[in-house]
């Protein structure tokens, strides 16, 4: 069973992000806009209830998270990914740190950069053109996310689905 943990924003902000993703993100149909808290990890099916309990325990002291998408940014030159940058807060960092440890399916490969991906799988020329447009359009969105979502990847459908949500705090 392949799982991941993410913060999923309100439907209205998902719609705003998806307006870009429909055009510029080749993973648009695979997953909704989100902030990755724990990248994909694999468990045995019989460990599912243990994982749910572990997630509940790890978030019990973490309050709902304020998310502020502040501007368009990118991961170039490492990869041609464009995203809406989310201001890193203590509570976001705490949530990330709870799940990126050796005792919970390993430490993250990359530093924590909270964001909503809006474009990926681009050529260098596409990247330059799209980044310029998106940067000009800008973003300034705030909301409080009260749930951590547990997602499961279906290899058959090549898609991520929310299978459980956990209330923060």
Curated annotation (Swiss-Prot):
Positions annotated as active site in the UniProt record: 34 (proton donor), 115 (proton acceptor)
Keywords: Hydrolase
Motif (HXTX 2): 115-118
Residue window of motif HXTX 1: 34-37
Pfam families: 2_5_RNA_ligase2
Molecular function terms, GO-annotated: hydrolase activity, acting on ester bonds
Disulphide bridges, residue numbers: none
E.C. numbers: 3.1.-.-
Enzyme category, top tier: hydrolase
Family the entry assigns: Belongs to the 2H phosphoesterase superfamily. YjcG family.
Protein name: Putative phosphoesterase SE_0715
Organism (species): Staphylococcus epidermidis (strain ATCC 12228 / FDA PCI 1200)
